[in-house]
């Protein structure tokens, strides 16, 4: 099982060990979810100001948030799916706020790496099509998160 993950650290604060942890966690999630080898995504670490801009411009919410997912497989009205014969599956992009990650880790009383892993996995599951808009969907998605984090050994 092998994902192709491009990491971008606009904050220049994220240690290599955290990048490696996220890579391994998302590989585990991909394996458990049956994601094809060679599937691509990007993970970008930003500050609160940058994620606030993205949240405002794309979601109409003028405030910082912890993680935003841009799923390339979400089809809008009138869009046509283009599938190339030998093209890898492209899931999309994850944007994670490092300051919010630190704040939430402290707020929830667990480690920075646990919160960072949780946010990366949460965003990854959104890229795979999971959501939490209804109680039923939330139960399914949060159950998946707990199962994968547990299998990976990243507990509260």
Curated annotation (Swiss-Prot):
Its cofactor is Zn(2+). HAMAP family: Endoribonucl_YbeY (MF_00009). It is found in: Cytoplasm. Its EC number is 3.1.-.-. PROSITE patterns: UPF0054. Disulfide bonds: none annotated. The gene is ybeY. Keywords: Cytoplasm, Endonuclease, Hydrolase, Metal-binding, Nuclease, Ribosome biogenesis, rRNA processing, Zinc. One of its GO terms (cellular component) is cytoplasm. Single strand-specific metallo-endoribonuclease involved in late-stage 70S ribosome quality control and in maturation of the 3' terminus of the 16S rRNA. This is Endoribonuclease YbeY. InterPro entries: MetalPrtase_cat_dom_sf_prd (IPR023091), YbeY (IPR002036), YbeY_CS (IPR020549). GO terms for molecular function: metalloendopeptidase activity; RNA endonuclease activity; zinc ion binding. Gene3D superfamilies: Metalloproteases ('zincins'), catalytic domain. Belongs to the endoribonuclease YbeY family. Binds 1 zinc ion. The keyword Iron does not apply. It is an enzyme of class 3 (hydrolase).
